[in-house]
């Protein structure tokens, strides 16, 4: 088997599991032409979220990325983490997470960073704002994604560009 056939089989398998076995729906997709963005996934309230996200990523057939502290990207796991879309976060020199993550966008031609703005799986009343300031600093759009567990639906919103006015931008 060649790699193309393997990827096609993977996509068919993910599609079958997501739509047929689990009974979920997908509204909209992230266009492959959108090379850089922050994908915010809400809510992140259970361990199943991760597996649903992996299935959706496989169905859309685009790379979705994550960041982790640079110490995770050493032998033997570093190669694997990079292969599945990971990027090391270097916070040396007193850099905060926002600055360090914005730098990661500069180092890649294509980078679609997935984040959960709650910062926890517990229900929260307010989102953490780091994702917003990363988008502002890196000059990349935000793609909102909502998991509707009642309807078994993943809703992908339209990308939007942040203006620096958090309250107004979040009304979108």
Regions found by a protein language model. Give the residues of each.
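N-terminal membrane-anchoring alpha-helices
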Residues: 2-25
């Amino acid at each position: 088997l060649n790699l193309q056939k393997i990827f096609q089989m993977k996509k068919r398998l993910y599609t079958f599991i997501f739509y047929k076995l689990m009974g979920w729906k997908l509204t909209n997709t992230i266009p492959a032409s959108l090379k850089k963005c922050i994908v915010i996934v809400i809510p992140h309230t259970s361990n199943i979220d991760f597996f649903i996200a992996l299935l959706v990523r496989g169905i859309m057939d685009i790379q979705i990325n994550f960041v982790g502290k640079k110490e995770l990207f050493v032998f033997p796991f570093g190669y694997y983490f990079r292969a599945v879309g990971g990027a090391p976060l270097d916070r040396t020199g007193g850099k905060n997470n926002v600055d360090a993550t914005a730098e990661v966008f500069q180092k890649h031609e294509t980078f679609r960073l997935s984040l959960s703005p709650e910062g926890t799986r517990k229900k929260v009343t307010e989102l953490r704002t780091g994702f917003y300031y990363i988008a502002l600093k890196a000059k990349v759009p935000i793609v909102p994604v909502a998991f509707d567990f009642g309807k078994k639906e993943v809703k992908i919103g339209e990308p939007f560009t942040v203006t620096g006015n958090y309250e107004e931008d979040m009304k979108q």
